[in-house]
Amino acid sequence: EVVLDSDGEMLRNGGKYYLSPASPIGGGA
């Protein structure tokens, strides 16, 4: 699951980091 704040900043989610729904970072595809 991708979690972003209202500004699209990276948030921790399940130990993974996401920059945008289309660009998972940390191997969270």
UniProtKB/Swiss-Prot annotation:
Alphabetized InterPro entries for the sequence: Kunitz_inhibitor_STI-like_sf, Prot_inh_Kunz-lg
Temperature-activity profile: Activity is stable up to 60 degrees Celsius and declines rapidly at higher temperatures.
PROSITE patterns noted in UniProt: SOYBEAN_KUNITZ (PS00283)
pH dependence: Activity is stable between pH 2 and 11.
Tagged with keyword Oxidoreductase: no
A GO biological process held by the record: defense response to Gram-negative bacterium
SUPFAM superfamilies assigned to the protein according to its UniProt record, in alphabetical order: STI-like
Family statement drawn from the similarity comment of this UniProt entry: Belongs to the protease inhibitor I3 (leguminous Kunitz-type inhibitor) family.
Chain's role: Inhibits bovine trypsin but not chymotrypsin. Also inhibits trypsin-like enzymes from midgut of several lepidopteran species and inhibits larval development in those species. Has fungicidal activity against yeast C.buinensis. Has a bacteriostatic effect against E.coli. Is not cytotoxic.
Complexes and interactors: Monomer and dimer.
The protein's name: Kunitz-type trypsin inhibitor IVTI
Source organism phylogeny: Eukaryota, Viridiplantae, Streptophyta, Embryophyta, Tracheophyta
